[in-house]
Amino acid sequence: MRKWCPPFGSAFKLNFDVAVFSNTPSSSFGAIIRNGMGEVMTGLSARGPYVASSEEGEVLACRKALEFAIDAGFREIVLEGDNATVIKSLMSPRVNRSRLGHIYEDICTLTTSFRSLTVGCVKRGANVVAHSLARFATQLDFEIIWLEDSPPPAFEALYLDCVSLHD
């Protein structure tokens, strides 16, 4: 999928992403939850730990996004990220025995908190809002949460998503 598409029915869409830069020792996470009309329900920008790989950053961002959705009270979620390796691992029925297996196990446990959870992999173009929030978090020393308000760091990306919904 090249552009953001709304979820069906009563579900909410949760997009997540990580930003990792070679000049900084840490990662940063972004997550956005929107309804079927594309309206922002809540968004998150947060600093993360040092990561050794993009997969590690993405799987940590996924876990953070799911914790965020649970804490905000969402129970019907379409979860989307743009790292195919992470999404394939999440969808696999096999136990992940890699060095990141314990994080995948945490995610598996978190998924039991949802009445409905669908997981999908999207192209970067469909995940721009979450990526914008992850990039913004590199400037933060703390976590920022926006409730029912469009996060300023993602205004442009949200606008472009809205325009593409009506094309």
Q: PLM ranges: what are they?
A:
Residues 1-167:
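Primary recognition of RNase H-like, Mg2+-dependent phosphodiesterase/nuclease domains
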